[in-house]
Amino acid sequence: MRVSKVLTLASFISVCSYSEAKSNETDPNGYIVFCPCMGRFGNQVDQFLGVLAFAKALDRTLVLPNFIEFKHPETKMIPFEFLFQVGTVAKYTRVVTMQEFTKKIMPTVWPPEKRKAFCWTPRQAIYDKSAEPGCHSKEGNPFGPYWDQIDVSFVGDEYFGDIPGGFDLNQMGSRKKWLEKFPSEEYPVLAFSSAPAPFPSKGKVWSIQKYLRWSSRITEQAKKFISANLAKPFVAVHLRNDADWVRVCEHIDTTTNRPLFASEQCLGEGHHLGTLTKEICSPSKQQILEQIVEKVGSIGAKSVFVASDKDHMIDEINEALKPYEIEAHRQEPDDMYTSLAIMGRADLFVGNCVSTFSHIVKRERDHAGQSPRPSAFFGIRAVKRHIDL
């Protein structure tokens, strides 16, 4: 998946305008900076919603993270403003870009000798067995490269595991304890070794997705692809089918019915709406084809867009769609950010219930507009209600 190295002029002007308005200000309530170091983009965005809520509740400015791309053999850091509009997320809570923070705020507010890492509790180092227990915030990839990229090293650790609820500030007394233990006068920056938010995210933060609007670059690429390739109305589908994912789904236990990754997006909190099965997590090709054909027929779709981490099944889908005389399309080369934006604009979306990548699309479709846009999931059939007359 490719990422351009140059921001569009519109994005650049937007970021600069926002930064200039903030450049001479520092927040007396302090800052929060963190590494979105758990998993790939879907997981990172999932936790980011919780971090936004956490920063807002503590009344600190959030330093917008660099998102992490795992591209063998290197790890790439993608600035937040390259993907999303800074001004829109600032409508939810106070934020500052990583570049603004590191260049103009960090040197004075958070000098090198005061940089401490925050984690739940001390742990043993993985690679250096002789090291004392601690946060070890720069141990391994992507942790080390993430902090190195912004030129941060830590001189000590702070632990918050004794705070009731940890970073769940909804628990009684939690916010007060945070403010008492880590006052902004003594701790102007709370630097977390990982996201201070639960994973998977809870439904109470999903609506925050409406403040994450794609950058003008990504939006224009999505519009351009749709205009050139997708006749409307169109169905968009996300297929999660690489080998690692299949192995994850093999361990699903229907007797315990525990939530897995984003599964609560379709089965409800605690799975009170149903049971997670292997077929929902990793649907068969037959199941996928049947549901695509069903959804195409239900809205009279004129085209289908497919995003996938491995097998887009374009040939199989097109064969199944022959009676409708329409075709499926994909991006070549693939760009996951543009794919997400395209799926968000579809007339109907079919995703993977367990995938946090699919969940980005579902949340956007549920909350970005005045009313939710239709979405469905593979392996889950809509229940037809019987009405007695």
From Swiss-Prot:
Record localization: Endoplasmic reticulum
CDD domains for the chain: O-FucT-1
Principal subcellular localization: endoplasmic reticulum
Transport in keyword set: no
Pfam families: O-FucT
Gene Ontology terms: cellular component: endoplasmic reticulum
Glycosylation sites: 24
The entry's keywords: Carbohydrate metabolism, Disulfide bond, Endoplasmic reticulum, Fucose metabolism, Glycoprotein, Glycosyltransferase, Manganese, Notch signaling pathway, Signal, Transferase
Coiled coil regions, renumbered to chain: none
GO biological process, one term: Notch signaling pathway
Gene Ontology MF terms: peptide-O-fucosyltransferase activity
Enzyme category, top tier: transferase
Enzyme Commission no: 2.4.1.221
Pathway note: Protein modification; protein glycosylation
Gene3D superfamilies the UniProt entry points to: 3.40.50.11340, 3.40.50.11350
Catalytic activity: L-seryl-[protein] + GDP-beta-L-fucose = 3-O-(alpha-L-fucosyl)-L-seryl-[protein] + GDP + H(+); L-threonyl-[protein] + GDP-beta-L-fucose = 3-O-(alpha-L-fucosyl)-L-threonyl-[protein] + GDP + H(+)
InterPro entries in the record: GDP-Fuc_O-FucTrfase (IPR019378), POFUT1 (IPR039922)
Residues annotated to bind substrate: 40-43, 238-240, 356-357
Residues annotated as signal peptide: 1-21
Entry keyword Iron: no
More details: Manganese is bound to the substrate GDP-fucose, but is not required for enzyme activity.
Function field: Catalyzes the reaction that attaches fucose through an O-glycosidic linkage to a conserved serine or threonine residue found in the consensus sequence C2-X(4,5)-[S/T]-C3 of EGF domains, where C2 and C3 are the second and third conserved cysteines. Specifically uses GDP-fucose as donor substrate and proper disulfide pairing of the substrate EGF domains is required for fucose transfer.
Recorded family membership: Belongs to the glycosyltransferase 65 family.
Subunit structure of this chain's protein: Monomer.
Protein's name according to its UniProt entry: GDP-fucose protein O-fucosyltransferase 1
High-level lineage: Eukaryota, Metazoa, Ecdysozoa, Nematoda, Chromadorea
